[in-house]
Every structure is written in structure tokens, then in C-alpha cells.
Design a protein with these regions (language model features):
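Active-site-proximal mixed secondary-structure blocks
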Residues: 2-145
Length: 145
């Protein structure tokens, strides 16, 4: 055939068959410990539930998405106790912790009934708690779930 004819039916490049991933040889705890070695900023995400109660959790899965418009992204496990409030509520705050707030980060990383005891905050947009002493705080509207 001429130059404008159909392409040849012979493959010019070798075709490779993908190899299936093997199950990990490490435990979930070992994986968590290794990920914990990754230096990253730490945040506490806060909100007010429909019943007026406060929720908050330590999160390091925080990223900027866009400067214009200002958009951020963070992740939460579907099994998290605060998921119902954060997935249905309209507002929340992301509080970027300062270097001297390690104890606060640890407090909000664990399940505790007294998590909010003696924690200084102001009420932000939609009732979301804005933590005193945070290096920065973002008052957010839930755009995507």
C-alpha cells in the first residue's frame, strides 16, 4: 500500500503484560510507623455538629490545590468518628499548628471524651472552632465531598 494506506498490522514495539501487584510483606502497623517518619505539617480540622457538639481531629493529609480560587484538600477515613459531621456539615476550620502545639496535636489524634477541655478557640464561620495559637487557620466551606 502507499504512504496513505492503513497502518501495518505488525507491532513495532514489544507489548508487555502488566504484572499483578503482590500483597505487602509488612503489617499495617509497620506501614503506619514508616509513614509517621515523613516530615510534614500538622493540622487540626474542626467543626461544629448539628447538635452543637464540637468535633476535631489531627490531620497531616493537608495540601493546597489552587491559589486562585483558594482551594485546599485533606483526607479523612470513612470509618472516622467525625465523618458524619464533616461530610454533611457546611463549614469547618483547618488549623495549622505551630511548633509548640505538639501536645494539642497528640490530644486530637486520639479518641478522648475530654478532647476539648481547656482548649482555647473562637467561633468561626458556621460555628467551626478556630484554635488559639495556631500558626494559621483557614475557615472553609465544604465544596466537594
Amino acid at each position: 500500500m502507499g504512504q496513505n494506506g492503513p497502518p501495518p498490522s505488525i507491532a513495532l514495539f514489544p507489548v508487555t503484560v502488566p504484572v499483578q501487584a503482590q500483597p505487602p510483606t509488612f503489617s499495617a502497623d509497620e506501614f503506619r510507623q514508616a509513614l509517621g517518619m515523613f516530615a510534614t505539617g500538622v493540622t487540626i480540622v474542626t467543626a461544629r455538629a448539628a447538635d452543637g457538639s464540637l468535633v476535631g481531629l489531627t490531620a497531616n493529609s493537608f495540601n493546597s490545590v489552587s491559589l486562585t480560587p483558594p482551594l485546599v484538600l485533606w483526607s479523612l477515613a470513612l470509618s472516622a468518628g467525625s465523618m458524619p459531621t464533616l461530610s454533611t456539615g457546611s463549614h469547618y476550620a483547618i488549623n495549622i499548628l505551630s511548633a509548640n502545639q505538639k501536645a494539642l496535636a497528640e490530644r486530637f489524634a486520639k479518641k478522648r471524651d475530654d478532647r476539648w477541655q481547656d482548649v482555647a478557640f473562637t467561633e468561626g464561620i458556621g460555628g467551626a472552632p478556630v484554635l488559639a495559637g495556631a500558626a494559621a487557620s483557614f475557615e472553609c466551606f465544604n465544596r466537594s465531598r
